[in-house]
């Protein structure tokens, strides 16, 4: 059957998109200014993930390092090859290499069959011994993402093929690196079948690898220096550097962080998570509305329990005390059922509907105890936060949002902000369950929780003052980003130049996280992707009205002492 031609309106839209893309890419190409490249040898450029902002990030990196197209090889995956080729052509990249992980590989299929033969539970997969010491958690997460299930489905008729694909991806990674002997890899992610394999093998070989990531409208590039860095990739300060922050910088970060969190929970942030969490104004409610709807006593504390999207790479931040998010929820529910000192409000991830697939409600029993309720998805996130007294989360931004109000935060274990001293961080699964069984939310130091979390929010959500205005949209906006990108690049050429100069300095420094590198060298801070009529600059060295106490660099960052004697039921 012949492919149906585009309608006139669709054809015009396609032509407009192509023109927007060409103009945006031309601005990036024309800005290349380095006389000699910062990297010798072959550079492998990821083209397996097509997104306007990925090519923005690549263009900034090319400009910053003076990379030459003749040294580059475009890596193509199974999807969006035409679009990626078109973008690469704008940079005069002509060589390409296909990452053929979908090929029928007899050896990989046989090995997949052998691994699955003695696999009885999803937990068994996490104990597999894989080639090149590849982490089974990454294989688990890649398959889980495809299945869109809460836990890996062993009855999936395609499971053998999925495991074989993961094993083939490792073979393809080895063959690709052997063939091209690259000096540098530029990747969009270090997740999924082909990119997790490439990043792991490259790190084991000591090949320089930079992931061109972005978040909150800004560039969040990071580099792998060790294989285990694949589980530690969220832009962050090390604990000792956080403790050593000079008071004036901590204050400026806290002021900016507080302003950003306020804008975020007010529904003014443009990232996809915040849009779904806080821009739903259909039902805004008071605490009494919550207790009335749930038939709860108004005086009993309400603890929010925020559940992550079940199949969104659960192990990506080193989440190693649980099989997956479903396992965490399943072991938490009986403890919450026994702890009647609080009412527990279960909230599914706000993006679950957008993602599709299984969600929190699919895991819950038909009947819950009266003191455990399910938060309706229509309830506004800011109103829910205001109604709750504390929160339990794995590693969600809810921890920062609650802590900004001085409310206690209990984590399931390690995440990306676990060791900054504002949240209770259990070191083991059993310690988490022991704490969960107690009234852990009592006697919290609200001022300390708020102060420390706002500093982290400043580092995580905000950006340097000199960059104010150069904020890009969310990757989920897809092709609509091209037009906005052109406008931003045209409006802020000097800021783009400064960004590239810092990118060059960061690459030479050897530090892992670009955004942190940039923030620690700034003399002022402002909100990033929060819509506002004017931006406030929070200067280092200026007295802070919001946070007056300097960060105590001698303070131990161990979690607050919690009496782990179980409460009476």
Regions inferred by a protein language model and the residue ranges of each:
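Conserved nucleotide-sugar donor-interacting segment of glycosyltransferase catalytic cores
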Residues: 169-224
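A short, glycine/small-residue-rich beta-strand->loop->alpha-helix junction that serves as a flexible
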Residues: 47-57, 187, 313-319
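Histidine-anchored nucleotide/phosphate-binding helix
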Residues: 51-69, 73-78, 197-199, 322-337
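Conserved catalytic-core segment of nucleotide-activated headgroup transferases in glycan assembly
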Residues: 266-363
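Short loop/turn segments at strand-loop or loop-helix junctions that form parts
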Residues: 46-47, 76-79, 214, 302-314, ...
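A donor-sugar binding/catalytic signature common to diverse glycosyltransferases
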Residues: 187, 213, 220, 377-424
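Donor nucleotide-activated moiety binding/catalytic core segment of transferases
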Residues: 164-178, 298, 342, 352, ...
């Amino acid at each position: 059957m012949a492919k149906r031609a585009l309608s006139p309106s669709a054809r015009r839209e396609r032509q407009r998109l192509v023109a927007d893309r060409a103009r945006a890419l031309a601005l990036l190409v024309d800005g290349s200014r380095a006389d000699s490249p910062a990297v010798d040898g072959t550079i492998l450029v990821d083209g397996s993930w097509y997104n306007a902002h990925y090519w923005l990030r690549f263009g900034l990196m090319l400009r910053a390092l003076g990379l030459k197209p003749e040294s580059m090889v475009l890596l193509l995956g199974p999807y969006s090859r035409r679009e990626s080729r078109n973008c690469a052509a704008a940079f005069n990249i002509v060589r390409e290499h296909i990452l053929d992980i979908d090929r029928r590989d007899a050896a990989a299929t046989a090995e997949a069959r052998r691994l699955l033969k003695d696999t009885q539970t999803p937990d068994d997969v996490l104990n597999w011994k894989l080639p090149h010491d590849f982490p089974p958690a990454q294989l688990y997460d890649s398959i889980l993402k495809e299945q869109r299930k809460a836990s890996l489905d062993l009855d999936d008729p395609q499971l053998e093929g999925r495991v074989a694909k993961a094993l083939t991806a490792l073979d393809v990674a080895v063959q690709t690196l052997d063939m091209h002997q690259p000096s540098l890899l530029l990747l969009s992610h270090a997740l999924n079948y082909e990119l997790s394999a490439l990043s792991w093998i490259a790190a084991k070989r000591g090949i320089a690898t930079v992931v061109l990531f972005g978040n909150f409208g800004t560039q969040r590039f990071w580099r792998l220096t060790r294989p285990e860095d694949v589980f530690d990739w969220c832009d962050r300060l090390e604990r000792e550097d956080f403790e050593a922050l000079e008071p004036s910088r901590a204050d400026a970060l806290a002021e900016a962080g507080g302003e950003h969190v306020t804008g975020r929970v007010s529904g003014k942030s443009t990232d996809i998570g915040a849009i779904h969490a806080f821009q739903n104004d259909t039902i805004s409610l008071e605490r009494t509305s919550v207790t009335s709807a749930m038939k709860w006593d108004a005086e009993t504390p309400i603890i929010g329990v925020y559940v992550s999207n079940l199949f969104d790479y659960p192990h990506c931040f080193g989440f190693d005390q649980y099989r997956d998010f479903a396992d965490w929820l399943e072991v938490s529910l009986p403890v919450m059922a026994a702890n009647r000192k609080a009412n527990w409000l279960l909230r599914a991830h706000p993006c679950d509907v957008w993602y599709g697939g299984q969600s929190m409600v699919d895991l819950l029993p038909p009947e819950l105890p009266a003191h455990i309720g399910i938060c309706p998805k229509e309830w506004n996130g800011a109103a829910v936060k205001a109604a709750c007294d504390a929160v339990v989360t794995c590693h969600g931004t809810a921890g920062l949002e609650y802590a900004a109000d001085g409310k206690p935060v209990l984590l399931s274990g390690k995440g990306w902000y676990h060791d900054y001293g504002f949240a209770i961080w259990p070191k083991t699964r059993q310690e988490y369950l022991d704490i969960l069984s107690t009234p852990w939310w009592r006697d919290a130091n609200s001022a300390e929780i708020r102060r420390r979390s706002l500093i982290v929010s400043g580092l995580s959500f905000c950006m340097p003052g000199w960059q104010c205005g150069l904020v890009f949209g969310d990757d989920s906006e897809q092709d609509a980003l091209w037009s906005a990108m052109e406008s931003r690049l045209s409006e802020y050429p000097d800021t783009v130049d400064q960004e590239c100069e810092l990118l060059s300095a960061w690459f030479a420094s050897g530090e892992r996280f670009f955004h942190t590198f940039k923030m620690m060298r700034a003399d002022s801070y402002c909100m990033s992707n929060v819509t506002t009529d004017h931006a406030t600059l929070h200067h280092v060295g200026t007295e802070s009205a919001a946070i007056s106490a300097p960060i105590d660099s001698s303070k131990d960052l161990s979690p607050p002492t919690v009496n782990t004697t179980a409460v009476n039921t």
